[in-house]
């Protein structure tokens, strides 16, 4: 006695009815059954409005240049100034809960993304209790010092 899995049989079936109906005012609808790895069956239904013909654009006069032919180049936007101290700068740590509070370290890198909360990576000569020698700080938690 052989058993047949109906989900696998119908997953290969695809129905695309593109017949416009008069009741919908010329709106065509499509229904598709596509194979899916998770459920074995996926239903997709779309309704489309008929597209209206775009009005023809008037031809440009003989003495006018088309807009596409005009070579106007937009000036490139200037880059914003870099955030934070430069790489290698010595900084003092102002975060009270930090292991390196009032200590100095050198800047490894600064993330330029404005959404980054702690963009400045600082490396220290001394390791903390966990054996770590770097930490991230916010721009207001560090102060540049003379080397």
Curated annotation (Swiss-Prot):
Protein name: Photosystem I reaction center subunit IV, chloroplastic
GO CC annotations, alphabetized: chloroplast thylakoid membrane; photosystem I reaction center
Transit peptide, from-to: 1-46
Membership in a protein family: Belongs to the PsaE family.
Keywords from the named record: Chloroplast, Membrane, Photosynthesis, Photosystem I, Plastid, Thylakoid, Transit peptide
Region annotated Disordered, chain positions: 49-91
Function recorded in the entry: Stabilizes the interaction between PsaC and the PSI core, assists the docking of the ferredoxin to PSI and interacts with ferredoxin-NADP oxidoreductase.
Localization annotation: Plastid, Chloroplast thylakoid membrane
Low complexity composition bias: residue spans: 50-61
GO biological process, one term: photosynthesis
Organism: Hordeum vulgare
Gene designation: PSAE
Major place of residence: plastid
InterPro entries the record matches: Elect_transpt_acc-like_dom_sf, PSI_PsaE
One matching Pfam family: PSI_PsaE
The keyword Membrane appears for this protein: yes
Top-level lineage group: Eukaryota
Membrane disposition: Peripheral membrane protein
